[in-house]
Amino acid sequence: MPYAASLSAVGGVAPYTWSLVGGSLPQGIQLQGASGAIGGTTSKPGSYPVSAQVTDASGKVATAGFSLTVIAASPTLAVTSSFLPAADASVPYSASLSATGGVTPYQWSLVSGSLPLGMQLLSSSGTIKGTTSIAGTFPVSLQVTDASGNHASAAFNLTVSSTTTTGFDGPAELPRTYIQSAMSNTPAPGKTITVNAGGDLQSALNNASCGDTIQLQAGATFVGAFTFPAKNCDESNWVIVRTSSDDSLLPAEGTRMTPCYAGVSSLPARPAFACTSTKNVLAKLVMPVTGSGPIVFAAGANYYRLIGLEVTRGTFAGTAYSLAFMRGAADHLVFDRLWLHGLAQDETGRGIALAGTNIAIVDSFFTDFHCISGTGACSDAQAISGGGGNLPMGPYKITNNFLEGSTENIIFGGAAATMTPADIEIRQNHFFKPLTWMKGQAGYVGAANGNPFTVKNLLELKNAQRVLVEGNILDYSWGGFSQSGFAILLTPKNQAGNNGSNLCPACQVTDVTIRYNLIRHVGAGFQIANALSDNGGAQLDGQRYSIHDVVIDDMDGKHYNGASLFAQLSVSAGAPILQNVTIDHVTAFPSTMVLNIGAMLATSGPMKNLVITNNILSVGTYPVWSTGGGPGNCAYYDRPLTTFNACFSPYTFAGNILIGSSASFPASAWPSQNFFSSNANSVQFVNFSGGSGGDYRLQSSSPFRGKGIDGKDAGADMDAINSATAGVE
């Protein structure tokens, strides 16, 4: 590096002349006699003692000794990694970056592009790690900064390959097929049609050819119920309908849309958006009257992809039933980076009403879907619903969305059907209900007449088959309407119709896997029940459930007006037997009861193949309790071991850590091979935090380390949950 210094003198008669009278400067460094400046560049490290002399105009001299030290230069800072190893979707990933030169320690940062949801860059180590369900190629620029503030960067492509995780998880069959929804999977090689503000969107939709892209002017509003016609397109020629904004102004593929992109910096009582800009870059579609729209897919519509749109309703009095609606057998649709929303106090029944096959909903944001209790025209509201009708349904992909619905955030079933939707992937979504929808809360928001919105649960399956629910965060559910604040319901139902009819004798809920999820702020956990319809009709089936590695945090029946129970397991007389249910490695802290059990043995017989293992559960005041019905209920005596022996055959209940069992329910009242702790502190969690917002891993000193029947710690694998849910909120 260039070097510069200057010698100085005082006294005598100027001007001065400088010279070396002893020693030598390193090669490349020189003393300027007239100025006393020392400068140059050298490649010779070492210590150089010299003696310098100054002579004034009268000939007087003075000398002084110095030592010039030359330090070997650090190598130039550089990123030495040349590529990132490929990743597989839904498989844990870890890759470390490397650099040389500069001064350690290094800090790493992402300077452009984005990693797929579920992946993160650890700044101190330069490690990219996590689990993503999103396949595609993600270009990123990564920068290393050394301790001296020097920077170096390099560009990489992280390729995530799709995986078909088929087979079984415990008793439950996983989806047999998964939708590939990357942009590269939906080519549109045709012409571009631009529709400016005031233009005729319906005409553009009618006239577009397969492979065309329809660009809607960013910032413009298009009012109407727009029909997306059937065109008989194919996998090589999609029709894309999108904002005219450049891709660089939108969230990158695989990154969730937020209202920021419509110029909205925040919404009350929702998580912060962290906007980098509030420029409106979306085109807006508005339904002007009561009904379903503004997006309506005609029967046979196929191969459409929607990108960068705000989809909503007008301010009319009345109900908007579905903002996106399918009239018949639509197929191959992708809803990508959209904001779908109702208005703060209206009735908007649902965002997307699913029907048809091969439909993906990705990276989108759903808000303000609600029905008004007591006086409303609709009874249930959801962000996404499906599972009704007489046409094939599924596969469906619902990943990386913010999902807000008052009654259920997602529901499959609850209507007349002769078919069952199958192969449903629900991953890495944030299910959310604003707490301000709860009457009595500060900032309460209900209907204009003051009535609250109807709230039931976060996820309900009444008609669905081969469902994977993985890596989601589910926030807020409370009771006070027809349910008790449950988070998730697996309740196959033959819905009742008029005049004593039953609408869905073929309805079933089978092969459901719920894993690596975080549930928070709820009144109760799971309701798993095979019950008859109001007209006494039985469903087809309800069985093969695998629930594992789930944390239920802040389960508070008092605050959320719920039952504060972990799980209800029940069968009503005449319904199919509940069987093949595994609940393993779950952590939850109910205050009332662990299990609410019911089966009428005279008509149903015991539930079969129940496996409840390796969980950490507080047992509550009434640990294992009957659902009612008198002595005919197998759980009538309300004693754990007695109830299990009567209600389940065969069953396994072992390896569980049971917290707070009172003297009324000693260890002898439970099956053997379980462990008991008088309180949460003696379990020795890393941080119990009252069962709300804690770290429920076990400390190394915990007496319960490795006590699961599989040799692992009981309770949910929090590291796996944190990895699966990284970036979800």
Model-identified regions with their sequence ranges:
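Beta-solenoid repeat scaffold
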Residues: A182-P187, C210-Q217, V223-K284, A298-I307, ...
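Predominantly extracellular beta-rich ligand-binding scaffolds that present long acidic/polar faces
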Residues: G536-Q539, R544-D695
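Strand-loop-strand motifs at the edges of beta-sheets in extracellular beta-sandwich domains
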Residues: L25-S43, L115-S133
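Extracellular beta-strand/beta-solenoid scaffold signature
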Residues: S236-V239, V281-V296, A317-R327, A344-A355, ...
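Right-handed parallel beta-helix/beta-solenoid
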Residues: S162-N207, A218-A220, I240, S245-L249, ...
